[in-house]
Amino acid sequence: SPTRALRITEDGNHIREKHSRFATRTAYNSSNESANSKIPFQSAHVNVGGDFSDANDRFTAPVDGDYAFWFHTNVARSGSGSFFATWYKNGSEANSAHGGRMYDQHSGSGWNNLSGCIMLNLSEGDYVEVYNGGQSVNYDGNSYGQFMGWLVG
């Protein structure tokens, strides 16, 4: 039987049923993520196209195009000070002209919400990951964080 890739509803909405998109949660770790390490994620609870892999904690672009990504979670660290997470594209930090780092300041107790989004132009086979920045911090997981992305066009 044929695969339906695009459906237009009676009121004009375009439904792209096979359009690449994913959402996953931060894998809970009761210890700190070391500086400059990749943030681990759980199996995706949305993974249309199967383009997110929890085996290597990355999204791989199935086609050339513009992709939007969003990341958020609660973060704590020992003592007060700044911390950041950052987007990686093909193994290198995607900052500067692309936007990049997600910063916050920790008071020394409790949790802070860290979030950010980015739009990247990707070629087929390019991959995107989220990394912890230059400080050892604890990324909360399970019910508290999410990494998601989708093909915009």
Q: Where does each model-flagged region fall?
A:
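Extracellular jelly-roll beta-sandwich "head" domains, especially the C-terminal globular C1q domain
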Residues: 5, 9-153
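Short, small/polar residue-rich loop motifs at catalytic or cofactor-binding pockets
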Residues: 1-2
